[in-house]
Amino acid sequence: MKLFAVFLLFCLVNQIYCRRSRSNTVEVTKKCKSGGKDTSMEKVEVEVSGSFYPTLELPDYCTHRRLDDDKCSKFCEHNCNPPFKRGVCGVWGDSQAGNCYCHT
């Protein structure tokens, strides 16, 4: 009976840990508009903890020239997955150039 109780406790702890681990990652799809077409890139999982928000790195061929804030923000918003709704884009001259920051 004790062995069975230990087994149940182990299963419960394992379930809570696994569920928590899964909820701490968000899948982000890297994309870039090229010649009016969406070119899909690989999907990446980014860990989310505390005030850290996932960054969406733009492919090199999207960052050769500075994107204006409006276009860049729209690009980021389009690529932010729930629960992240809004995107802020780092621009050249900024240490975060070429990254989209997704936030709620």
From Swiss-Prot:
Cellular compartment(s): Secreted
Motif Putative integrin attachment site, chain ranges: 92-94
Signal peptide: 1-18
Domain of life per record: Eukaryota
CC annotations in GO: extracellular region
Keywords: Cell adhesion impairing toxin, Disulfide bond, Secreted, Signal, Toxin
Disulfide bonds: 32-80, 62-89, 72-100, 76-102
Reported function: Inhibits proliferation, adhesion and migration of host cells as well as host angiogenesis by blocking host integrin alpha-V/beta-3 (ITGAV:ITGB3).
Subunit structure and binding partners: Interacts with host integrin alpha-V/beta-3 (ITGAV:ITGB3).
Name assigned to this protein: Salivary protein FS145
Organism encoding this protein: Xenopsylla cheopis (Oriental rat flea)
